[in-house]
């Protein structure tokens, strides 16, 4: 999908500034999949390419909700340059491959909204590579495991968004598990209001959530986690390195949160990323919480005009059934 004429003109000026050399923008196409920001591939007249991230309200398919702009909530939407740059800097410092930044514009020099132009990595994402050639994906998975280990080893004494914690701030809640429980209860209420199957099981799901949370023991150090590191959020560069994208939600949190998401998204392909020492009580709580989140979130997104509706409805349906399976007698 091409951008609006006004957006294209803004991207043209930014692309010239980012890439230099007298180049002119020849084409700009929105890349499918982005739901919180506009992601455009920019093609210049000499075939040089780059990616533009545009954090504009018109590019965000998610309905607004109270607390969206409260960055002390680790799960508030990851929007804007401040979060992106803080996450990018932390991952680079840890040796995790991310797209190189070519230009940032937070002052409206090119666009009224926050804008970043970054390196284009036009090859496959990890999910496509795993489906096409598992043997070729094996070394990429091994390197991804190394990146995850570097993130796991870097600890902070408090949890929250990297931009907040690295800036000396603190986050709401008493602990990771309390924040997750509160969020899961909200997701449960929202899903129950939209689907009678969840409504019928609401009391049992709430009882299970509270019981699992009560089993979690306190923790005082937190690792770096991406939070949504599915195979579509890992690109593969020309030499086979995994490249993390959609990094704005990067936070210090329980590492189990990351591994639950990886298990859900990768299924059997998760095995090369398995690690020892994960807390089984946290894994149990976070698994149910994420199943509820992946039910309520897609149903909420479908209230708007998100284009890939069939896929999003399928995600909600699958995770709804998985959540119910977790309380089956």
Language model: regions and residue ranges:
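An alpha-helical support segment within catalytic cores of ATP-dependent transferases
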Residues: 7-22, 109, 134-142, 149-225, ...
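Active-site Asp-x-Gly
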Residues: 61-64, 221-225, 230-287
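An acidic site on a long C-lobe helix of protein kinase domains
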Residues: 140-143, 255, 287, 291
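Regulatory N- and C-terminal appendages and interdomain linkers associated
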Residues: 1-24, 28, 113, 323-329
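ATP-binding pocket architecture of kinase catalytic cores
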Residues: 29-36, 40-167, 171
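ATP/Mg2+ or Mg2+-diphosphate-binding catalytic cores
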Residues: 190-200, 294-329
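Short strand-connecting beta-turns/loops that link adjacent beta-strands
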Residues: 45-47, 109, 238-240, 288-291
